[in-house]
Regions:
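Conserved PDZ fold ligand-binding element
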Residues: 14-34
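Conserved Radical SAM active-site core
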Residues: 58, 65-211, 221-250
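Structural preference for beta-strand elements that scaffold enzyme active sites
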Residues: 143-145, 181-183, 214-216, 262-264, ...
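PDZ/PDZ-like groove recognition
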Residues: 1-9
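Flexible glycine/acidic-rich beta-alpha junction loops that bind and position SAM and/or redox cofactors
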Residues: 192, 212-238, 258-281, 354-360, ...
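Flexible, glycine/charged-enriched surface loops at secondary-structure junctions
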Residues: 22, 212, 254-264, 345, ...
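Radical SAM enzyme core and accessory elements
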Residues: 4, 274-446
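PDZ domains, with a preference for the canonical peptide-binding region formed by the helix
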Residues: 27-51
Length: 446
């Protein structure tokens, strides 16, 4: 295995050795380099033996370093091989429920422990072996994000449709004993792993604290594309409230015993149950934002905090913004408050129902351009449309349905502004000049 160099940092020790972009690093101290985790770990030393494939063959160096830290090689990919694909057939898998016509990359299911550390992906551990656990502990790759779902081995085999689903639960205590911090995700399926099974899971995971540093529960997503899949019944207000009660009960007990809650229901449970989102203190360090835990609380608090700061506004501004059905009431309330404090700013909120996936999906991050066009075309009141960044891929240029921001702007006949995910930054974006402004000048208006 090898990792190919994409760029050499100027003035670095790698440059001093004569390494070039395109060279391939093979090993450090005879340790094969499979990915950038290996590279970072083995080159963070005062001396090492480096082997690389260069333009004229294989070269080796005995490296003596003046100081530890980055060696100076950058890579276009973090992995020397392919991503580890998922070997499960989970009863709740959202990717299996995707409609056709979306971005091609969305149909790939990864289950790679390296991506867990590098990018926060959640893994089930079913394609991991003992030597990979040993490597994580040796290199102290921490934290690791694990999709647990249940600690009942037989039930986990059933839920993941993988015979190793229960067996690999033994890796959890090994990781914890090895000093690896773990964030846990529980995707709950109504009548399957909630109720008493949820109590069992939370009780088992609490035995692994404090190295299990957070546990989040999210409801199984249900789209209209579940043909030939396990029948899932969406959670309603009553069953969502029951999940909240169990999670909060165990969270309260954990806080009494360990001084920290660590157990959090995602925002969606509270919205489904018709209960208010808890205050910021409930979420402590906001360890599970990517699972939608405390995201609405943080957004609201940051937005209001920014509104409380003084802002000098010139002229008038008008903008339309879109959001999903879950966040719709909160975003509408915040925009009304913005207009109340700054009457010269008028924000029209368009709550977009997710017909693309089906009526049970309400998060803003899964809204597509297709639904925005279908529901908002001809209804905009300004020349600017604000799109939350969570609706787009990381490069902020393409929706889930493979429609680009430029294509949406052309179809709608407006300028499209990508709004930040942070509540404070979104408030700043709406308050700053340059969205759609009319300024009064002496002798007339423009």
């Amino acid at each position: 295995m090898a990792i190919k160099i994409d760029r050499i940092d100027a003035g670095s020790e790698a440059e001093a050795l004569g390494l070039q972009p395109g060279d391939e690093l093979l090993s450090v101290d005879e340790n094969e380099l499979n990915d950038t985790l290996d590279y970072d770990f083995y080159t963070d030393s005062s001396s090492f033996h480096l082997k690389a494939k260069v333009a004229d063959g294989i070269r080796e160096w005995d490296v003596r370093r003046t100081e530890r830290g980055p060696f100076g090689c950058d890579f276009s990919t973090y992995l020397g091989d392919q991503k580890h694909s998922c070997s499960n057939h989970c009863m709740f898998c959202f990717i299996d429920q995707l409609p056709p016509g979306m971005r091609e990359s969305l149909y790939f299911k990864d289950d790679d422990e390296r991506l867990s550390f590098l990018f926060g992906n959640y893994i089930t551990m079913t394609n991991m072996q003992d030597h990979e656990i040993d490597r994580i502990i040796k290199m102290h790759i921490s934290p690791i994000n694990i999709s647990v779902h249940t600690t009942n081995p037989q039930l986990r085999v059933r839920m993941l449709a993988n015979k190793r689903g229960g067996e690999v639960l033994k890796y959890l205590p090994r990781l914890v004993e090895g000093g690896i911090a773990v964030n846990c995700q529980l995707v709950l399926c109504r009548g399957i792993n909630d109720g008493e099974e949820l109590r069992r899971t939370l009780g088992d995971l609490l035995e692994l604290t404090p190295m299990v540093q957070s546990i989040a529960a999210v409801p199984c997503g249900v789209t209209d594309y579940r043909q030939n899949l396990f029948k899932q019944t969406p959670y309603d207000a009553e069953t969502s409230a029951a999940v909240i009660d169990i999670m909060e009960e165990f969270g309260d007990e954990c806080k009494r015993r360990h001084g920290k809650r660590i157990i959090y229901p995602s925002d969606e449970w509270y919205l489904k149950a018709g209960r208010p989102i808890p205050p910021a203190e409930f979420y402590e360090d906001f360890d599970q934002l990517e699972n939608g835990v405390g995201m609405m609380r943080l957004f609201e608090d940051e937005f209001r905090a920014e509104l409380d700061r003084p802002h000098r506004i010139y002229g008038t501004k008008q903008i339309d913004v879109v959001t999903g059905t879950m966040a719709g009431p909160l975003i509408t309330e915040l925009m009304e408050e913005l207009h109340h404090q700054y009457p010269m700013i008028d924000v029209k909120v368009h709550v977009v129902k997710n017909n693309f996936f089906g009526g049970n999906v309400g998060v803003a991050g899964l809204v597509t351009a297709t639904d925005i066009i279908a529901q908002c075309e001809g209804k905009l009141e300004s020349g600017t449309l604000g799109i939350p960044a969570v609706m787009l891929r990381e490069e902020k240029d393409t929706f889930l349905d493979d429609v680009t921001v430029a294509q949406l702007a052309q179809r709608m006949g407006v300028k499209v502004e990508v709004l930040p995910t942070s509540g404070g930054e979104e408030a700043k974006a709406l308050l700053r000049s340059g969205l759609h402004i009319s300024r009064r000048r002496k002798g007339g208006t423009t």
